[in-house]
Amino acid sequence: MLNIAFRNEVERRIGLDEGRRNRMYLDSLGIPTIGVGWNLQRDDTMHALAYCGVTDAVGVISGKVCLTDAQVDKLFAYSFAPIESDARTSLAPGVYDALSDARRFVVLSMRFQLGEAGWLAFSNTRGLINEAETAKLAGALDRAHALFMLVGDHLATSDWYTQSASRGVRNVTMMRTGVWVTA
């Protein structure tokens, strides 16, 4: 998939998974959230809202003021900017870029959903992804397949999976198979 097509698909899928709301709401963990999964408790919320052209940040945070669609788009772009570089550096050199588009999406989705520290806590999973893709690149396809299945098993037994409902099921399937699952 071309870079622009991949980026558009990533944005579409994350938007479906996270939802898109112009007014503050409480997410599944009770965290004040807005836009496409923006945690309003983040340290950089005031800066991000100002960057998006918000003039009443306190009103937005309290739920009294809504963001415009353009502000939601800009906030998502701001929040997504570091995600791909974080995902790339969280894996062994060359592994992220060698993954299938579906597997790269799973890594991006988890990094977006969990934050950097949350994604980095999946050290065994990341190690298995490194090992699986390295085996695939070396032509050891049976070993790579078995390792990607194991990655899926690790994810499916995590708290992330339990809390992620249909997103977790789709992402585990994509990690195991390397192909897109309908969203």
Name each model feature, range by range.
Residues 9-19, 106-110:
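Short, functionally critical alpha-helical segments immediately adjacent to catalytic or ligand/cofactor-binding
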Residues 10, 28-30, 103:
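Residues that flank catalytic or metal-binding motifs in active/ligand-binding sites
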